[in-house]
Amino acid sequence: MEDFVRQCFNPMIVELAEKAMKEYGEDLKIETNKFAAICTHLEVCFMYSDFHFINEQGRSIIVELGDPNALLKHRFEIIEGRDRTMAWTVVNSICNTTGAEKPKFLPDLYDYKEDRFIEIGVTRREVHIYYLEKANKIKSEKTHIHIFSFTGEEMATKADYTLDEESRARIKTRLFTIRQEMASRGLWDSFRQSERGEETIEEKFEITGTMRNVADQSLPPNFSCLENFRAYVDGFKPNGYIEGKLSQMSKEVNARIEPFFKTTPRPIRLPDGPPCSQRSKFLLMDALKLSIEDPSHEGEGIPLYDAIKCMRTFFGWKEPYVVKPHEKGINPNYLLSWKQVLAELQDIENEEKIPKTKNMKKTSQLKWALGENMAPEKVDFDDCKDVSDLKQYYSDEPELRSISSWIQNEFNKACELTDSVWIELDEIGEDVAPIEHIASMRRNYFTAEVSHCRATEYIMKGVYINTALLNASCAAMDDFQLIPMISKCRTKEGRRKTNLYGFIIKGRSHLRNDTDVVNFVSMEFSLTDPRLEPHKWEKYCVLEIGDMLLRSAIAPVSRPMFLYVRTNGTSKIKMKWGMEMRRCLLQSLQQIESMIEAESSVKEKDMTKEFFENKSETWPIGESPKGVEEGSIGKVCRTLLAKSVFNSLYASPQLEGFSAESRKLLLIVQALRDNLEPGTFDLGGLYEAVEECLINDPWVLLNASWFNSFLTHALR
């Protein structure tokens, strides 16, 4: 019977039935008829609700799948299939919003058109007997009862059948099909009588005639008749199955399944070489902002106007000079590029009306920095296919780099709180469905924990820069447009604030394909002296451009202000994903939500409030050489968000490969911790696949280092 249920019903229905039986402490291996009955009841409830909607006039309408009107309000709220806590939450919410009387027992559905709860019954007996049993149990005239039988009969309160005839016929046909399928397998009598608790009568069903011929013709290869196949299935033992399949593949394949013990795995080998360097598209922890509070200047909101206003707040400009040269670049060109930006901004201020956008003069330094006329000339293949030594463009293998402490510091900083609020979520209207109350509560708690987080600042900065760069790339393809790097936030007191991080100058941008590259030069303010970690700034030329007075407890302190300049590039597809960095908030919220759900299912009630408000409880955050790090739920939220943000900022083929391959190793280790006695073949090949992704990417190297810490502590 269990096999039949798994074949006959949708996997989602089977999973819900399994959860329901587990919730009531019943063993589906023993109570197989009950398992089938629960699945049948669930399917009828879902079919009852399917395709029924309420239109804007409040009328009930039927909409088939794929119809654009499917965005209309569902006529029925499904209560059956939810765990008890969630089901009662839904019922209570419906009662609060509609004024309906709260039922004593959990009903199956709520009908928004007729404003009533519905109890669905599916019986293998006489419908009127089962109806009376239901009515006596519920003892409420407010709950509508609708009973279906496997014979096509039905009975409902006051003969009000709620649904149209076609919808009910669909349910009856499905029940009849289930009965037929059970009967053909010799399961129906047992199932029918189990509702009354009668003794089961074993009946031998012989398949004859056409059906027997069809059965014999539908067998896998190598089986001559149904009996042979039945005997094989009954005697099938899965042990040794993988080895058997592998041996069939090829004579060269000789894979032996090796047991995986605590002593089996070794640490992942991290590459040796010079320390890795920063490769993000903009500065992270080292960024400096020039800010204006409560902006109300003319043209407020226009990036160039905002940038000029922010630049005016700083008075410590001085003659710039190079303090950390770029090893391979022409450093005077970077210096001249910054001087050109200052000069052209000054020219704008001298104009009567400030323009909304600024296109830079195409000077020799900018042409060099933006790679103008540097691309190799493209030649039609037909013109050179006869060249005898035609070969692919040669490029060196990337140099291996070792992990450096700066990337861990970057991550730690991303998890910290700032003194500003970086996100204000839009109002999304009143909660309508009951489950929306819980969703809103979770969203609000999560937002409170991450709205001040530095990782959230990186999201908003990334969204702004990528949006501005993509817009400029499309609107001013041939121009070297000056793009201010801006973000907006609110102070603790709620005052609006506009921040300027620096500038981008965009190169030519005739982007036809998603992967076509636009070059840009970034110029970003910072107080970080690059000489402290020169390896981090390998790709940058760093200028000293001014002195900034910083408030301190004793007296103002003067600190040199630096400008980090580099040539960079991006593509349409990368900018498109950069514009959607807010998705990181959603991903980390979903991870937190799964933690809440796990806790709620153990406690059998929604634990959202307790989860966020119990400040004394700590949760695992991650692995470090010291062991498992723990922190508050807020720290967990911010750490998960920072991981998601860094996956976006440092997205690369190396990260894709490492994530996919290391996950396989993680699953094997997890199986060992769960005492599932995992076996492996070609473990060396898996390590090879993981380690070939460790080349020079700082974020991948940090993840590999964390993975080694996990291995150490997981296998103690």
UniProtKB/Swiss-Prot annotation:
MF-aspect GO terms: endonuclease activity; metal ion binding; RNA binding
UniProt modification remark: Phosphorylated on serines and threonines by host kinases, including human casein kinase II.
Short motif Nuclear localization signal 2 (NLS2), span: 184-247
Cofactor(s) listed: Mn(2+)
Motif extent (Nuclear localization signal 1 (NLS1)): 124-139
Subcellular location field: Host cytoplasm; Host nucleus
Signal peptide, first to last residue: none
Gene Ontology terms: biological process: cap snatching; DNA-templated transcription; symbiont-mediated suppression of host gene expression; symbiont-mediated suppression of host mRNA transcription via inhibition of RNA polymerase II activity; viral RNA genome replication; viral translational frameshifting
Keyword NAD applies: no
Disulphide bonds in the chain: none
GO CC field: host cell cytoplasm; host cell nucleus
This enzyme's EC code(s): 3.1.-.-
Residues where Mn(2+) 1 binds: 41, 108, 119-120
Binding site for Mn(2+) 2: 80, 108
InterPro entries in UniProt: INFV_PA (IPR037534), PA/PA-X (IPR001009), PA/PA-X_sf (IPR038372)
Record flagged with keyword Metal-binding: yes
The entry's keywords: Cap snatching, Endonuclease, Eukaryotic host gene expression shutoff by virus, Eukaryotic host transcription shutoff by virus, Host cytoplasm, Host gene expression shutoff by virus, Host nucleus, Host-virus interaction, Hydrolase, Inhibition of host RNA polymerase II by virus, Manganese, Metal-binding, Nuclease, Phosphoprotein
Enzyme class: hydrolase
Family: Belongs to the influenza viruses PA family.
Role summary: Plays an essential role in viral RNA transcription and replication by forming the heterotrimeric polymerase complex together with PB1 and PB2 subunits. The complex transcribes viral mRNAs by using a unique mechanism called cap-snatching. It consists in the hijacking and cleavage of host capped pre-mRNAs. These short capped RNAs are then used as primers for viral mRNAs. The PB2 subunit is responsible for the binding of the 5' cap of cellular pre-mRNAs which are subsequently cleaved after 10-13 nucleotides by the PA subunit that carries the endonuclease activity.
Subunit-structure text: Influenza RNA polymerase is composed of three subunits: PB1, PB2 and PA. Interacts (via C-terminus) with PB1 (via N-terminus).
HAMAP family for this protein: INFV_PA (MF_04063)
Protein name listed in UniProt: Polymerase acidic protein
Organism: Influenza A virus (strain A/Fort Monmouth/1/1947 H1N1)
